[in-house]
């Protein structure tokens, strides 16, 4: 398992390995891992190979013992020759199961290495997909409330402390802060990828734990920091959030995400097949395709996590206009480090060390001259100096 993981890792990042001239280091690490595998496999195969001969030798010793002892007793006229033959048959019936056990032991030994990971996976606690007396998502407007939320991936280390906020239907909420402040974690809690340690998250007054997970997540459309596209046609990837969408709807979503013109330049258009890692399109184009997928899904709540971090400035402006149209009348959460993209947000939540230290719109936060103003001015100064 370790050597397979190492090979897969190096294969996936072979360009980085070559760029840093680490081929010899990678080969050396592979040889070390392979030597460990060879030594353990050699011992395993040696013991497995010796098991059957040893069992057969033990069985043959039984025949020899019966023959010698039986011959001696026959000479003494203690038993008959027929009794000796009977004992030989009994020995065969006794040794045959032992040999079968040895064969099974070889099979168990060969699967022992994999069983540890398999049972580790099976022992993982499954998500509770269904709630008792679940609340229907039909008719929900998209009002979101965080009530004194506490959370930590490790209960002994809480990273989000007493998080509280109210978001009204149709508002655009921006969450900003330094790396590790807890911005992305809040989104994962909202969609119940994790459950809060204490407190509650509510949608239209209903605790999100009262919804079935699948129905809850149907309310959300996501554009993640790490784009994900599967091996298949471009149209199938865009339709992932709405499998029954027509081709015309796919094209409309692509136009709204400003990716339609790019798709038209491809030899097969929307039927072009993306490879396993979608490496036959650029990172910016992958970002646009995921935005088109979110537009087509038409969610009630939209989540953008660094949505425009991998595209050029011109494309970013186009995407921002398209997303502004999409977010009208729809509750939207935007996570971004470039504060220039969220100046029009209805509410900006400034997070630091898991806590909301400031909140308000862009102008209000600048007037406070606090942490947000410090972040914004530092980015503006950096942009000016680079220009």
Region locations from a protein language model:
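Conserved catalytic core of Hanks-type protein kinase domains
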Residues: 10, 20, 121, 265
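Conserved catalytic Walker-motif region of ABC-type ATPase nucleotide-binding domains
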Residues: 30, 118, 146-148
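ABC-type nucleotide-binding domain
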Residues: 123, 130-131, 137-387
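Transmembrane helix-loop junction
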Residues: 18-19, 72, 76, 265, ...
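An intracellular "coupling" helix at the cytosolic face of ABC transporter transmembrane type-1 domains
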Residues: 2-9, 15-61, 107-110, 127, ...
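Helix-loop-helix
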Residues: 43-117, 121-122
């Amino acid at each position: 398992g370790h050597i397979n993981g190492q090979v897969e890792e190096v294969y996936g990042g072979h360009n980085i390995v070559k760029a840093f001239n680490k081929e010899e280091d990678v080969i050396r690490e592979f040889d070390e891992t392979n030597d460990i595998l060879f030594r353990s496999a050699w011992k395993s195969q040696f013991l497995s190979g010796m098991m059957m001969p040893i069992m057969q030798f033990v069985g043959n010793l039984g025949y020899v013992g019966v023959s010698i002892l039986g011959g001696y007793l026959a000479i003494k006229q203690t038993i008959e020759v027929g009794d000796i033959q009977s004992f030989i048959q009994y020995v065969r019936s006794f040794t045959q199961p032992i040999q079968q056990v040895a064969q099974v032991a070889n099979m168990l030994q060969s699967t022992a290495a994999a069983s540890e990971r398999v049972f580790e996976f099976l022992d993982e606690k499954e998500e509770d997909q269904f709630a008792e007396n679940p609340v229907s998502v039909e008719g929900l407007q998209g009002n979101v409330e965080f009530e004194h939320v506490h959370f930590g991936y490790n209960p002994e280390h809480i990273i989000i402390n007493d998080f509280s906020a109210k978001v009204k239907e149709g508002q655009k909420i921006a969450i900003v802060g330094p790396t590790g402040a807890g911005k992305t974690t809040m989104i994962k809690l909202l969609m119940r990828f994790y459950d809060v340690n204490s407190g509650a998250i509510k949608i239209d007054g209903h605790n999100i734990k009262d919804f079935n997970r699948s129905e809850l997540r149907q309310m959300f459309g996501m554009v993640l920091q790490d784009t994900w596209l599967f091996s298949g046609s471009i149209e199938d990837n865009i339709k992932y959030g709405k499998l029954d969408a027509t081709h015309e709807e796919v094209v409309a979503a692509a136009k709204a995400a400003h990716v339609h013109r790019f798709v038209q330049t491809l030899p097969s258009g929307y039927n072009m097949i993306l490879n396993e890692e979608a490496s036959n399109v650029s990172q910016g184009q992958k970002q646009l395709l995921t935005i088109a997928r979110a537009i087509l899904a038409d969610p009630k709540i939209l989540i953008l996590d660094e949505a425009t971090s991998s595209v050029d400035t011109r494309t970013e402006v186009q995407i921002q206009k398209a997303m502004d149209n999409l977010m009208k009348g729809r509750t939207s959460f935007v996570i971004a480090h470039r504060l220039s993209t969220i100046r029009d947000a209805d509410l900006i939540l400034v997070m630091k060390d898991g806590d909301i230290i400031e909140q308000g719109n862009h102008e209000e936060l600048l007037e406070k001259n606090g942490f947000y103003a410090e972040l914004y001015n530092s980015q503006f100064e950096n942009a000016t100096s680079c220009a």
